[in-house]
Amino acid sequence: MANKLKVDELRLKLAERGLSTTGVKAVLVERLEEAIAEDTKKEESKSKRKRNSSNDTYESNKLIAIGEFRGMIVKELREEAIKRGLDTTGTKKDLLERLCNDANNVSNAPVKSSNGTDEAEDDNNGFEEEKKEEKIVTATKKGAAVLDQWIPDEIKSQYHVLQRGDDVYDAILNQTNVRDNNNKFFVLQVLESDSKKTYMVYTRWGRVGVKGQSKLDGPYDSWDRAIEIFTNKFNDKTKNYWSDRKEFIPHPKSYTWLEMDYGKEENDSPVNNDIPSSSSEVKPEQSKLDTRVAKFISLICNVSMMAQHMMEIGYNANKLPLGKISKSTISKGYEVLKRISEVIDRYDRTRLEELSGEFYTVIPHDFGFKKMSQFVIDTPQKLKQKIEMVEALGEIELATKLLSVDPGLQDDPLYYHYQQLNCGLTPVGNDSEEFSMVANYMENTHAKTHSGYTVEIAQLFRASRAVEADRFQQFSSSKNRMLLWHGSRLTNWAGILSQGLRIAPPEAPVTGYMFGKGVYFADMFSKSANYCYANTGANDGVLLLCEVALGDMNELLYSDYNADNLPPGKLSTKGVGKTAPNPSEAQTLEDGVVVPLGKPVERSCSKGMLLYNEYIVYNVEQIKMRYVIQVKFNYKH
């Protein structure tokens, strides 16, 4: 029943159906139940039509199947038995009897290449295939790689993806070409029987977001033949040799290989989208953690939430599972965006189309059957959105590695995940001076221009990262240390708390950062709160209050992408805004840290482009987390 699902589960189910995910739980339940009822009605109607027609064809199909079996030689009968998951021992008579009985039970013709069409015909941009509801399917993992979710169950039960040494014969290929309206995938796997006696080659292809067509070649008696077919197909589709894939070179109108992170080989296990189980399945009160901490960990370590957030911003987690994202894929995403940033001001439409296609090839998106021309990355705003997406994927890549041990194997998964963060969280009581100071700072610095929502503190924690305390020591008595806000997507917090705030990598485009690549802070709460990207349907947010050693600041009125090249003697950049907390109302803590919690006042000089101040440091050693604030957004409209 829909009402038994949790809110994040309801949103995920609705997103899978392409329905709105906004609203309170009661609204979500009603929306999902209506959709389920409509689906049931359609299925009943379809089944009724099928029954009326299938009764006439059942016997004829069965006779055709049995007739084909009788014309096969022993080797062909054995191959057919393997495909059906049947015993392959015995004489021709035994095999024939076994297959005929199976035909009587399921009434299907001999299993040949699924859908019967060779992939050379390609996907025709996917327009001839109806887009069906794609559900999250439980995939089967044996060893390093996950068997494709659409491989027949009888094959899954007996086969695994072949691995020889460091070579895992599993490839996901992607090709997006904006001008030709292509957004397609190609899956390629060598399957080895669990008995290691037979081998098959599985392929599936189509437009991103649909099941597509598939083909199963074999079985073969040795892996040599299967590997030959696999490597030839890989070369045919990508114009690269499988043996040289680590130095992969993309070619126009060819597929690109998406590198997967296989990690260490694990025991056979079913996995959901090949990402770790969600901690939200465990009730916080069942953990030995303080209930407040346990609730927070269940929020930020919720993989369903991560998948949902990424789906909402267009990422296709079914094509490149969140748990298998490699660092090289993220780097490639940044590299393409960097090249886009270099031509975006010239507005070279043809080049922007080419580069947008290259980005969507590396970072798969599900656009359904919309025209690809709608999704060209041709404005600074669109570029910024994609940079933020890749940043989020980078944080998720860290988080999924952090949570990679199946919490089901742990007595207390929430406690296990908390330990993995290596960040101490101490709850702060609502009646404490600290809580009052933070609440005051938050309330006073909520800008008038951000009046579409109010925010309340759900939980407040003192944060302690040992590594930060040690490296910050050199700045602990320096002048101009301030307590400043930093907000980020909910998907990012497992990575941030475990690794600290980090600076964008060299391959990221500098144009995505107004004052160069650094860590950005604000003295206005709502400016940072906007970077939580909460909404009416997902109104949880998390922010940091950090002690930041600013030293002498390089004050700028206008953006400067090269501001990270600080003038001699300067330790940080301040983007000067038109409105800022009243400095005369600031509070200084016992250790000398300044808290700019005064009510906003306007600057006498109106020059500049920023509404509010921004503070940027380019050395993470100048940052020390002080508080983690979990908040609830209450939207007025």
From Swiss-Prot:
Query: What CDD domains does the entry give?
Result: parp_like, WGR_PARP3_like
Residue span(s) of domain PARP alpha-helical: 286-404
Q: What class of enzyme is it?
A: transferase
Give yes or no: UniProt keyword Nucleus: yes
Positions of the SAP domain: 2-36, 69-103
Residue numbers of the DNA-binding region are: 1-140
For this chain, the family text in UniProt reads: Belongs to the ARTD/PARP family.
Composition bias, kind Basic and acidic residues: at what positions? 35-46
Which Pfam families does UniProt cross-reference here?
PARP (PF00644), PARP_reg (PF02877), SAP (PF02037), WGR (PF05406)
Q: Where is the WGR domain?
A: 158-255
Swiss-Prot/TrEMBL catalytic activity: NAD(+) + (ADP-D-ribosyl)n-acceptor = nicotinamide + (ADP-D-ribosyl)n+1-acceptor + H(+); L-aspartyl-[protein] + NAD(+) = 4-O-(ADP-D-ribosyl)-L-aspartyl-[protein] + nicotinamide; L-glutamyl-[protein] + NAD(+) = 5-O-(ADP-D-ribosyl)-L-glutamyl-[protein] + nicotinamide
Q: Which PROSITE patterns match?
A: PARP_ALPHA_HD, PARP_CATALYTIC, SAP, WGR
Xref: InterPro entries: ARTD/PARP, Poly(ADP-ribose)pol_cat_dom, Poly(ADP-ribose)pol_reg_dom, Poly(ADP-ribose)pol_reg_dom_sf, SAP_dom, SAP_dom_sf, WGR_dom_sf, WGR_domain
- Residue ranges of domain PARP catalytic in the record: 412-637
The family database entries (PANTHER family) matched by this protein are listed as: DNA LIGASE (PTHR10459), POLY [ADP-RIBOSE] POLYMERASE 2 (PTHR10459:SF60)
Cellular component aspect of the GO annotation: nucleus
Q: Where is the composition biased (Polar residues)?
A: 106-117
Which residue numbers does the motif Nuclear localization signal cover? 41-62
Protein known as: Poly [ADP-ribose] polymerase 2
Q: Tell whether Repeat is among the UniProt keywords.
A: yes
Catalytic activity, EC: 2.4.2.30, 2.4.2.-
List, as start-end ranges, the regions of compositional bias called Acidic residues.
Answer: 118-127
On the tree of life, the source organism's domain of life is: Eukaryota
Q: Which UniProt keywords apply?
A: ADP-ribosylation, DNA-binding, Glycosyltransferase, NAD, Nucleotidyltransferase, Nucleus, Repeat, Transferase
